């Protein structure tokens, strides 16, 4: 049976683009790939071909820690009323899966309208703080300034281009600083596309690679809920 392999239009790299880029390179450095695809798509680029803000990567500004009192401002995440499908899924998870903790299904968008709400909420409230504290953690604050858009992207409720455009527009309008916007866009245009490229290029052998030789079982403290 003849099969036609169609490209996934919910990614921004073209078929064969990653493998062509990697050909002849000894090390697949994500930063180099990220710059290449930014140039091609014109994301965070100026008319003269230079990166917006004068630098390609502002990660050095994105490593702040909270002071002793913790985050100065936090935002309650949007929650959604469970529909019939979510309710059934919750029952199935409780019945058939022995998982640690409690489900958080009410916090995750399950349709396009909800996904757009989460995106707009992130751009309006959290993106301005995302860059400074994207690596920070604080007790009893599981969300902080993160977007919660990973599942919406992977389930194709949002297109990566619309998410990137929303973030870039926030910087160009003065709503969010460049380090926050560039750091966020790098997660989607850089890491998301890069990891997909590695997956398609290296699998299935890649699944069994173990460069660090990790073969010990995780200790009990990973499962006990106490540290």
PLM region spans:
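Conserved functional hotspot residues or short segments at active or partner-binding sites
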Residues: 114
